[in-house]
């Protein structure tokens, strides 16, 4: 029988860097996490994962089976470098090819959700044409994902185009496809001028996972838990009362810290204490 516990995961970039997934999943298990979210970012190293051999993919699957720690989601931020809204046809084609490979990779190793970065372009100036190309690129991507039975889920971003659940829902309604859903980040959502609780309620029925991090206005990364503006307890209460039962993912970038495991354990305890206050988990 499946556990009724809230699934709590950790972002790959919170754990020590390296390519040994057995070691990474063993550490995540030791730290008490149910799953790890893989990163495929714009660096050549992480992008190269999409070209893994059959044997490399099988090694990841075997590590999951051996440890019991799942890898159910991928954070696909490579589209910052190869955006779907690019006005350069070659760059945009690369972006679509990355999407195709990511969906195939997910299908091969059992990843269910690919979190998308909501940028039409990142390093260039946005305009109506970049937004149109982005929409068309999403439509093509969701068609690929539908055939593979892999969910694409839009993150709420550090970028005006996708700064709220309401904006992301506009794309969900435009695409009108069950394989396109939302993956909000309560940190990013709180850093903008949003009614956070109303936004979370509006997304219920489309939210497939939740990123957990702290932020400040204009500061979207590396804000220690408890030092930002996020009202975690209230967010957790809203999600619980709205009927959300899905996974939560602690997002951190401590892979280069002196002791990443200690940083992660501290964050885990802090987050679980807020979850306990919200009645989601038992107090430690």
UniProtKB/Swiss-Prot annotation:
What catalytic activity is recorded? L-ribulose 5-phosphate = L-xylulose 5-phosphate
> What Gene Ontology biological process does one annotation of this record name?
L-ascorbic acid metabolic process
The record's keywords, sorted A to Z, are: Isomerase
Any idea which GO molecular function terms this record carries?
intramolecular oxidoreductase activity, interconverting aldoses and ketoses; L-ribulose-5-phosphate 3-epimerase activity
Q: Has keyword Isomerase?
A: yes
Question: Pfam families annotated for this entry?
Answer: AP_endonuc_2
Q: What Enzyme Commission number(s) apply to this enzyme?
A: 5.1.3.22
In what pathway does it function?
Cofactor degradation; L-ascorbate degradation; D-xylulose 5-phosphate from L-ascorbate: step 3/4
Enzyme class, one word? isomerase
| Signals that turn on the gene | Induced by L-ascorbate. Repressed by UlaR.
Could you confirm whether the keyword Nucleotide-binding appears in this record?
no
Give the superkingdom in one word: Bacteria
What family does this chain come from, according to its entry?
Belongs to the L-ribulose-5-phosphate 3-epimerase family.
Q: What does this protein do?
A: Catalyzes the isomerization of L-xylulose-5-phosphate to L-ribulose-5-phosphate. Is involved in the anaerobic L-ascorbate utilization.
The molecule here is called: L-ribulose-5-phosphate 3-epimerase UlaE
Species of the source: Escherichia coli (strain K12)
Q: What is the lineage of its organism?
A: Bacteria, Pseudomonadati, Pseudomonadota, Gammaproteobacteria, Enterobacterales
């Amino acid at each position: 029988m499946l556990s009724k516990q809230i699934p709590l995961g950790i972002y790959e970039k919170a754990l020590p860097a390296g390519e040994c997934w057995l070691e990474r999943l063993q550490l995540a298990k030791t730290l008490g996490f149910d799953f790890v979210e893989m990163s495929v970012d714009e660096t050549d190293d992480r992008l190269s994962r999409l070209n893994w051999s059959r044997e490399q993919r099988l090694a990841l699957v075997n590590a999951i089976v051996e440890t019991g720690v799942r890898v159910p989601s991928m954070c696909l931020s490579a589209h910052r470098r190869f955006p779907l809204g690019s006005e350069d046809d070659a760059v945009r084609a690369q972006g679509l090819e990355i999407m195709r490979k990511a969906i195939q990779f997910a299908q091969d190793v059992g990843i269910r959700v690919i979190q998308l970065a909501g940028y039409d372009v990142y390093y260039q100036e946005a305009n109506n044409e970049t937004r149109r190309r982005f929409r068309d690129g999403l439509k093509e991507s969701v068609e690929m994902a539908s055939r593979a039975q892999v969910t694409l889920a839009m993150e709420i971003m550090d970028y005006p185009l996708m700064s709220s659940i309401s904006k992301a829902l506009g794309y969900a309604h435009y695409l009108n496809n069950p394989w396109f859903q939302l993956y909000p980040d309560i940190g990013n959502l709180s850093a903008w001028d949003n009614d956070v609780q109303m936004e979370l309620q509006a997304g219920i029925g489309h939210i497939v996972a939740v990123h957990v991090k702290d932020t400040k206005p204009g500061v979207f990364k590396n804000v220690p838990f408890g030092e930002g503006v996020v009202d975690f307890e209230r967010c957790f209460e809203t999600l619980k009362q709205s009927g959300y039962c899905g996974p939560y993912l602690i997002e951190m970038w401590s892979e280069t810290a002196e002791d990443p495991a200690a940083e992660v354990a501290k964050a885990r305890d802090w987050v679980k204490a807020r979850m306990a206050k919200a009645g989601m988990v038992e107090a430690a």
